[in-house]
Amino acid sequence: RIYLHHEMAQTPVFPSKLFFFCEQPAESGGATPICRSDCLVARLEHELPSFVEACAGKGLRYTHTMPADDDPGSGMGRSWRSTFRADSRAGCEVRMAELGYSAVWNSDGSLTATTPVLSGVKNLEDGRRVFFNQLIAAYSGFGPAGESPDHSIAFGDGEKLPADMVWKACQIAEELTFDIQWQTGQMAIVDNHVTMHGRRRFSGVRKILAALIA
């Protein structure tokens, strides 16, 4: 399972559009859930106003361990090479410095990196406000099983996120979610500025092709 998120919102650089094409749907499960963040932030402003303003005012920092090589089978399997478009540690370190990251190299070749402060809530050019982040995914599934989600995400000032409010936000997002039940040959275009997406659990072979547009 991959939890709801805006693609690469845990980085300073992210795509504007996502294109999906179903080559082969899973035997069971495997839907792509989508949730409009403008609708979500409207609900959150009504039910959790202090949480929304904290995300907007303080921003968010993410900490994530990236493998040396891509792992397509994992929702968190994007390597540091792919993330930073670097072929070497030295190149990666240069790119991280440009983007404001701090990081530690691990003995297995993986990289544990912490982002600069990134937005939790954005105002789009058309006036809409969106819950633009990877908060739900980071809190629900970035770290290893059993690890506190506080290791994966915090407010920009280092303060822990209020767990009760995070889980309430997750619940509201799920209420607003629509599942794309894939059929062979089906295509979907997602506006990454407005819409979060994820992946439901599945069994069997599932081939959904994806392309990211800057």
Describe the function of each predicted region.
Residues 2-4, 13-214:
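Active-site environment of non-heme Fe oxygenases that use a 2-His-1-carboxylate facial triad
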